[in-house]
Amino acid sequence: MLYWLTQLLQGQYHAFRVFQYLTFRSILASLTALIVGLLCGPLMIRWLRGLQIGQMVRSDGPQTHLSKAGTPTMGGVLILLAITVSCLLWCDLRQTSLWLVLLVTLANGLVGWVDDYRKLVLKNSKGLPGRWKYFWQSVIALVAVSYLYWNASLPVHTQLTVPFFKTVTWDLGVFFPVLAYFVIVGSSNAVNLTDGLDGLAIMPIVMVAGALGVFAYASSNAVYSNYLGIPYVPNTGELTIFCSSIVGAGLGFLWYNSYPAQVFMGDVGSLALGAALGIVAIVVRQELVLLIMGGLFVIETLSVILQVGYFKYSGGKRLFRMAPLHHHFELKGWSEPKVIVRFWIITVVFVLCGLATLKLR
């Protein structure tokens, strides 16, 4: 909205031409989302406390988590509010890729909200049954990937780019929707599994989103993409602003979610933000780079898969003390802040490796 207003004023006031630049609007978007998060955070926390929407803690988990019982959750609503407000203010709303990404994010947030509402308000311990959660995630993903597939007007739209190789691409053709579906649903659930400690998930989300914003910016520019040897994907520049909004909103949320957390994001936040990372990676054609940068989410998910599989086929034995992996280290005696910071450090390494693919080809 403000971007549209600045467009009208450019003819009379040359200073407003600065709003044409993605970099400038990205900074403003990030700051806007940060301010919305910081200002609305206390109001959201008080409101959730008033509704008695508090976290339920597993009795079989680390005993240190028992003190978290009753901590307000569903704070992901605050993150989504900050992202949406920021995008509406600073994005060029004529770009369809922005609306696709934003709608996929909010739709997955709605699925998470229903799950949280059933668990925390209706006191249904199972929340939204797994099969229904997966069903609605699948519907959202299939609608999104079908739109992308049927509107693919350039070869790059269905090509898989292999990191570290300048000329290695695979034309997925009819298999593009399959890959895209698993990226969206998989990313959404992987982030959800990681969100188990104070601030553990949100900081990696911020780092990966920021890096994806760099890819979105470079991919939308023919000169930069040619120089870096990455796919040129027209009309995706506004996703830089979307990613910047995630960065700002995430940092604003971390202010209240850092240890000891005053609020948790809940499924409404984790499912939405995971899906956001997935759909952005698909649109800018960097699915494999997301796999690298989101390595922490991959490791956490694999720990659950391995734990369940090993338990099933070994007759009840466990590979880890507890899954996801962050709980394993807690039960080994690591303090919660130590687990969190070390997992953040791991994410920094993964994100740097992903960014290295911009030049190492």
Curated annotation (Swiss-Prot):
Necessary cofactors: Mg(2+)
Positions of transmembrane segments: 27-47, 70-90, 97-117, 134-154, 167-187, 199-219, 236-256, 263-283, 288-308, 338-358
Compartments, as annotated in UniProt: Cell inner membrane
Record's function text: Catalyzes the initial step of the lipid cycle reactions in the biosynthesis of the cell wall peptidoglycan: transfers peptidoglycan precursor phospho-MurNAc-pentapeptide from UDP-MurNAc-pentapeptide onto the lipid carrier undecaprenyl phosphate, yielding undecaprenyl-pyrophosphoryl-MurNAc-pentapeptide, known as lipid I.
Protein family: Belongs to the glycosyltransferase 4 family. MraY subfamily.
NCBIfam families: mraY (TIGR00445)
Protein's name according to its UniProt entry: Phospho-N-acetylmuramoyl-pentapeptide-transferase
Primary gene name: mraY
